[in-house]
């Protein structure tokens, strides 16, 4: 179980969503990607009309991600967001998921 406070949780997830949104803003002219962030939920739509949806699950202190392939639940562990089922680290996962759906590699983290 996460040791985050609700305040820490919201700050961490808001930072992730902002970082993704800023990167999408940089590349939106090069790739046919639309996105919208509203109330802790970020929808990303690709040229093929598929989507990735990221949203807060505050009661569980998790970040949930839905792709056209599956749903993923990330919990904060040892300074990283880790998927409960597959053990993937969030930034590695989201870069692969976007590449699969956009057809182009996108680097979100440093």
Question: Where in the sequence are the language-model features?
Answer:
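N-terminal intrinsically disordered, cationic/polar leader segments
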Residues: 2-110
């Amino acid at each position: 179980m996460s040791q985050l406070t609700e305040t820490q949780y919201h700050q961490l997830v808001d930072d992730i969503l902002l970082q993704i949104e800023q990167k999408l803003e940089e590349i939106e002219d090069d790739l046919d990607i639309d996105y919208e962030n509203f109330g802790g939920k970020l929808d990303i739509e690709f040229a093929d009309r598929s989507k990735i949806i990221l949203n807060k699950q505050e009661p569980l202190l998790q970040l949930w991600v839905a792709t056209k392939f599956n749903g993923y639940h990330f919990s904060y562990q040892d300074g990283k967001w880790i998927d409960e089922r597959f053990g993937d680290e969030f930034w590695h996962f989201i870069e692969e998921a976007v590449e699969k759906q956009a057809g182009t590699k996108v680097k979100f983290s440093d």
